Every structure is written in C-alpha cells, then in structure tokens.
A protein has these predicted regions:
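Nucleotide and nucleotide-moiety/phosphate-recognizing core
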Residues: 2-105, 116-130, 137-142, 149, ...
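Short glycine/threonine-rich catalytic loop with a Thr-x-Gly-x-Asp
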Residues: 108
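Hydrophobic alpha-helical segments within soluble ligand-binding/sensing domains
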Residues: 111-114
Length: 186
C-alpha cells in the first residue's frame, strides 16, 4: 500500500494559497481516480482506493503545515507502510519557478517546515518527494505572507498543468524507478 500525502493547511482560507499545492494535487488524484476523501482520523483527511492496480491512501494532514509529520507518522504506523518505498509527499517549493517539478528520493528539508517535521517524525530523510514550484518570493516580502498568498491569474493557469503533472509523477513513482520518474518529470 502506498501513502500519497499532499501538504497544505486546512480550511477555506488557505485552499488556493501557494502553500496548498500538495492538497490541490491530492484533490486532483481524488477526482481522477474516484477516491473520496471522507475519513478523518490520525490527524488527517484521507481516502483509500486503487490507482493502476496499487492500493493507495490519499492523505491531507489536518495538523497545519508545520506539524505534518505527526499525521504522516500515525498513518504509516497504523497501516504498516514502508516510508522509504511507499510514501510519496507532494509540496510547494519556492526555489522552483511556478509549475516546475522536482522529484527526489531523499534530501534535506531545504527550509520547508512541513518537510522538516516529517523528517523529524520519520527519523530520516529518505522518502519520495514531488516538489511543485511556486516561484521565489519577491524582495521585501515576508516568506509566510508569500506562501500563504494566492497565485496571479497567469500563474494559476500554469499551476493547473503542474498539478496534473505532479499527479502523473505520483502514479509513476508507484511503478517506475526513481531515475525514470526524475528523467521524465524534472
């Protein structure tokens, strides 16, 4: 069983912010594969289903971004999922241009507090990640204000395509090697 976790903040206030690209990608996967996100436990909102022959849990931690590791750890433990091979985390990255993807199998948090908390709760940094570019914050902007801000209309169009590509990358990570997925989507 795979756990595909999209990071974000719960609530309508944050739904369309830069920080919620993970949630939006999970919503796309949910719609595309008819997996209802209706279960609420382990500090998360999730649904179970099958994608291309693989059992999956689509997960949106409800702990707020900076505590995402609590929810993910609980789900992994409860369902006995191997985080090194069967956890895929989708999240925003300000070091990438809007719409650009970067697939990785391990690495530091790169300043992302949600990833930092996941690494803390897992005890290591080896898990599959899909970073979705949201663009660099403009000079003079507060980082929190930037990631909790909304995309421009032009950026939103680019982002819709990136959510589709991120969802495709998540599915590919269940079947293909890390190198194959990196070569196709990076």
């Amino acid at each position: 069983m795979y756990v595909i976790a999209g990071l974000g903040n719960p609530g309508d206030k944050y739904a369309l912010t830069r920080h919620n690209v993970g949630f939006r990608t999970i919503d796309l996967l949910s719609d595309k594969y008819n997996i209802s996100l209706t279960e609420e436990k382990h500090k998360g909102l999730f649904g179970k289903g099958v994608i291309e022959g693989e059992k999956v849990i689509l997960l949106k931690p409800q702990t707020f971004m900076n505590l995402s590791g609590e929810c993910i750890r609980e789900v992994l433990d409860y369902y006995k999922v191997d985080e090194k091979d069967q956890l895929i985390v989708i999240y925003d990255d300000i070091s990438l241009a809007p719409g650009k993807l970067r697939i990785r199998g391990k690495g530091s948090a790169g300043g992302h507090n949600g990833i930092k908390n996941i690494i803390l709760h897992l005890g290591h940094d080896t898990f599959k990640r899909i970073k979705v570019g949201v663009g660099e914050k403009p000079k003079g902007y507060d980082l929190a204000d930037y990631v909790l801000g909304h995309f421009s209309k032009e950026e939103e169009e680019v982002m819709k395509d990136s959510f589709e590509r991120a969802s495709q990358a998540a599915v590919a990570l269940m079947h293909d090697s890390m190198d194959q997925v990196m070569n196709k989507f990076n």
